[in-house]
Amino acid sequence: MATAETALPSISTLTALGPFPDTQDDFLKWWRSEEAQDMGPGPPDPTEPPLHVKSEDQPGEEEDDERGADATWDLDLLLTNFSGPEPGGAPQTCALAPSEASGAQYPPPPETLGAYAGGPGLVAGLLGSEDHSGWVRPALRARAPDAFVGPALAPAPAPEPKALALQPVYPGPGAGSSGGYFPRTGLSVPAASGAPYGLLSGYPAMYPAPQYQGHFQLFRGLQGPAPGPATSPSFLSCLGPGTVGTGLGGTAEDPGVIAETAPSKRGRRSWARKRQAAHTCAHPGCGKSYTKSSHLKAHLRTHTGEKPYACTWEGCGWRFARSDELTRHYRKHTGQRPFRCQLCPRAFSRSDHLALHMKRHL
């Protein structure tokens, strides 16, 4: 009772501050709720008379008895409604083992809505004996399993999670489960400790497969891999024959595409020969035509006799109508023979002379 007298001020000091809308009963309830939360070293004695707030104006004995009777706790009612845990009982977990679960299993809600799991009841902790576990500092408790996490993720000891089997999904028969879920057989991937709920062993996937399997499911014309040596599949092999030439360009397996884009050397020569000779000689009695204007200009010099290219060698006064003729003539003075035969040691100053010589080796 000493704590009650030191904790609460007198009513006279409270009334001196101003009018309060709360009555004395409200203050009494507030004081008792605070005492229930901040309990001392032991539980209150039920045999002790109820606590009172001292005031200068003490009410009559009849009023005090009525208030004490109203404020007294109904212990029988509270003890029957709130039952503590069984002695020596451990917190129950409703999660199934991975081998027994056939679908998505969730643990049911706890049976009682009172205190935390594994702890004493509300009233049992308040009204129990002094050596009750509620008055001792609680030891470290294991965390209650999450309602939406599989038992393999709970900290309780559980068997080693198995690896979930993955394989490419083919639309043909025997392709496993449909609808984009992971199949059960094929390429095995070990399940990590922090893997999602759907990747644990014994639990089916609760969501569609990721989008990285799209190249296996978008194209309906695919067939299963043919029996033979296992090779790493590429993305182009999964697209099919119809999509290679249209969107990704031709490959070595499409000879028609290469034939259209890259013409052969023979085709280029024929195309060069078919070019129209637009430049025609206008000299009377000469109907020659040329594809280049420079060739026609050199030809006209034969009709006019013009020879603008003169040899600069000392003592040589030869002149030529074309520059290539002057170049061949100048090699006679220098003795230069740049065209050499690869089959014999002979060399020539003109390319046409080398061509005639190569015919002898044939």
Curated annotation (Swiss-Prot):
Consequence recorded when altering P338S: In CDAN4B; likely pathogenic; decreased transcriptional activity; no effect on protein abundance; no effect on protein localization
Gene3D superfamilies the UniProt entry points to: Classic Zinc Finger (3.30.160.60)
Sequence motif 9aaTAD, residues: 71-79
Pfam families: EKLF_TAD1, EKLF_TAD2, zf-C2H2
GO biological process, one term: regulation of DNA-templated transcription
Any Gene Ontology CC annotation: chromatin
Transmembrane intervals: none
Effect annotated for changing H357Q: In blood group-In(Lu); decreased transcriptional activity shown in a BCAM promoter-driven luciferase assay
Outcome (variant: P338T): In CDAN4B; likely pathogenic
Post-translation changes: Acetylated; can be acetylated on both Lys-274 and Lys-288. Acetylation on Lys-274 (by CBP) appears to be the major site affecting EKLF transactivation activity.
Mutation effect (R328H): In blood group-In(Lu)
PANTHER family: KRUEPPEL-LIKE FACTOR 1, KRUEPPEL-LIKE TRANSCRIPTION FACTOR
Protein name: Krueppel-like factor 1
Organism listed in the record: Homo sapiens (Human)
Upper lineage: Eukaryota, Metazoa, Chordata, Craniata, Vertebrata
Gene (UniProt): KLF1
